[in-house]
């Protein structure tokens, strides 16, 4: 049982390494971290009910997933070529659009929750 638990915990290592790498290299992710901390602090100050915490958690998670996937796609595209390529530009733009939509939904929900 202990060996299984240790193996499971070790399996999360690459995920945490990836998050750390993205945080160190992506200014937008640092902005999302600051926003996450600010919204969490505001929620604690306002003593939000559980359902509002659930909404905030979903929105925060959505933004983080979108930003991490965008970062991974950008790095993969840059690995393929650093030259101007129309299809790669489109892939990067689409991924950035996903982050924009996720962020807009999160901001809208934050206004609905805190106002």
Please give the residue ranges for each predicted region.
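Hydrophobic alpha-helical transmembrane segments
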Residues: 1-75, 79-80, 84-86, 92, ...
